[in-house]
Amino acid sequence: MSFLEDLELNFAECIQDGGKATLGVRQREEMDTTHCMKQNEIISQAVCALLNSGGGVVRVEIENGDYNFERDGVGLNLPPLFRNHLDEMLYGKLFLIYVSSWDVAASHVRLATLCSNLYHRCGTFTEVMDPEKALKFLKRVQDPRILGDSDSLNLQEAPVDDAQMILASDLFHSPQLQYLEKLNFTKSSHVEFQMFSADLSQGIRERLPKCVSALANSEGGYVFFGVHDETRHVIGCEKEKINCTNLKSTIDACIRKMPVYHFCGQNHKVQYELKFLEVYDKEALHGYVCAIKVERFCCAAFAKAPDSWEIKDNNKKPLTANDWASRMIEINPDLSSFPQMIPWKSMLNTTPCSKTVFTHKYLKCVEDLQKDYFPVSPNRITYTPESVYKDLFADYRGLRNLINMEMRCFSQGILIFSHSWAVDLGLQRRQDVICDALLISPNNVPILYTICNKWDLGNRHYSMKVARTLKQKLVNMGGYPGRLGIIPLVLPLGSHQRVRNDLEMPVYPESYNFITTQQVEALLQSLVIILFGFRPLLNEELNLESETVALLSDQQYGLLSTNLSKHREMFVHGLPGSGKTTLALMIVGKIRNVFNCQADNILYICENQSLKRFIVRKNVCQAVTRKTFMKNTFDNVQHIIVDEAQNFRTEDGNWYAKAKAITQRARDGPGVLYIFLDYFQINHLCCSGLPELQHQKPLLKLTRMLRSGDNITSYLQDIMHQIRENPPPNVPQEALMVGEELEWGPDVTGNLEITDNLNLEQMSVYVAEKCQSLWRSGYFTDVAVLFTRARDIEKCRDKLLLAMRRRSMSQLAEEPSLLVQVREGLDSLGSHVVLESVHRFSGMERSIVFGIIPMGSETAIFYNALLCLASRARTHLYIVKVVF
């Protein structure tokens, strides 16, 4: 086996090829300069890409066979800022550079960058901005109120040298110049002199973008090609050597090619004016000076794309100017409209790919979750989770002894079992694998044990893939900034066992060993973010520029960590706002990975069209309403998820019996049938088709109401009390005996207003004025106007539209962003006002909800409908009782 193949097989890392290189300080000094720089460039780009993508290894083939690491040194000229993230080691005939992730907090910038290619004028010189200065410049341009460094002027206030600019302008408009004429002004922050090079076009391409970028990013100015930069003598280019038409085309193409980044919504390039000034030697035309007037650019002008790289599809790719600039200035998302969510980890203090992590203020923080689920005990190896490893030890004879034998080499740490770490990470499970266990121990590199029926190359590759994915997620999602490697190790169980080949164990530098308990706990906290973290629906609903990660509750995580292979059927009773639909989608993803099935093998069933369309957009499974389900056969379906099941009916047949039959028909075992419901939110008095409560087994309850602010949640509890006192006749009383009393913290969140006895006109004005006030205060235009009776939408639509339009138009001139759309239904997400019936809005949510309730309309399910309506609101709930 070659060293390259051996490296790929043994290291669970993103490995980038650094090409061939001569190593050694003296040896590289003796190399051809161009060749030396090229080798350095290839290696630097690979290192940069790994820094921005979670780390990895750069492999370099050593060209000089007599190279000795201890004697010769390395000699590579890598950027100083990169060196703190690098370790080096020989591996046979390869030189390995171990790259840890870029540390955003330590470097103060989001991305590792070789060169920003963003220039500015520093006195009379053109200089490239280092990444930190480039970030400050971008922030100043984005918001002129932000002041720069003491040595860097605010772009909006920097004075222009009027005298120099006037003289430069006079020269630019001169009818002709004299050969060797000495100009009466010097280079300045707004004037640049350049001599023509022997190759006119090539010289322009190399030097002009830097000059134009620097001037455009300042206050504008002039570049004169053909003027000596020290003596100020006019030289020009001899007329025989210049073709003005061709050179004009070269200059135009050069400037048009320069990348720009706009904050202002425009898309124009750098504006300039070009003239060729005639230069005379006495009376004869000698040549030309090329004069370029550069206008000040509104935002940021790059000489070329930044020299910054990332890993995409396992290959290094350059970042575009747009991607680089937008990621550099990326900040934590504004979730002021969600006061119940608090930031735990800022994206500005972690790694380049990580996102801001939010937790619910009444849930455990990451540190507490880590101590509960992954405790680190001194002087012992802790096995966890108890339910998982005991289940595995009971099912697989010899597994306990195998694990205990392996742990004899370690005195302290934590061994985390999983039925499949692949599934936990969003990968497909390998059927031959019994389980995985992750060991994190002080003074060692973490080890991922893959226990399988036999050792083979397929299981080895599987273990490698899982270990590599885990490492990447710990860094890129969990935000772990330290040095990290994970060693994959396959352990066969039973008669196929063989002695482990230690050659399979990759070697990491000593700096990759965990030294302290604090390091172990920091990694475990990143692991908590991976296992408990999910992408909340508000990312897409509100089109947030920066994505966020939210954390599951204990109850939600308990459901998601259920072993689907053993628990194929489940009834999940969840209170309003407990995350039922989000969990249903996550269960769909887990089914696909556990059973290696496709989207068309999984069916999601709900009662209303709006929720169905919402799920269809996710493109993770089939989604239909109950009525459609009863009309079709679904031959490919193996697994079924039912959501909002309390609102199902039996008028079209026994849906539960049909779903049960579909999931039981496979020869290789039953499929998954998970049913989510909330009896509190039932919207009819008919038979739901659900089994009797005593037959709904196994049953799991979600009692934490997490969606809404405190005042709204308190209101929901009051309504639930009314429902318990007066339950609908088709709801079992014992099903309503769930819930919990919540204790509010000092900062009570959520806004609740109840208004009575409004007519249609007053109601329309009330809604429009409240929306206008909220939007002026900075809240998202994320509004639903919900009606307890669908027929009332038609009565109110025109009056609501007119009232909203009047208030939007009245302030359009001063605040055009407040002009919003009013729509019926939920065919699209985004910033608009939705008019819908509460029954059709079941399973959905909005930040701001207006509930339109007819006066005197109480029925047997009045409080159920009111609960469903009120629980749609995250932060603002307005109950409006209307006289129709």
Curated annotation (Swiss-Prot):
The UniProt record gives the binding positions of ATP as: G574, L575, P576, G577, S578, G579, K580, T581
Q: Which GO terms describe its cellular component?
A: nucleus
User: What top-level branch of life does the organism fall under?
Assistant: Eukaryota
- UniProt entry keywords in alphabetical sequence: ATP-binding, Differentiation, Nucleotide-binding
A Gene Ontology biological process in which this protein takes part is: cell differentiation
One GO molecular-function entry: ATP binding
Any idea what job this protein has? May have a role in hematopoietic cell differentiation.
Provide the family line.
Answer: Belongs to the Schlafen family. Subgroup III subfamily.
Stated name of the protein: Schlafen family member 5
Underlying gene: Slfn5
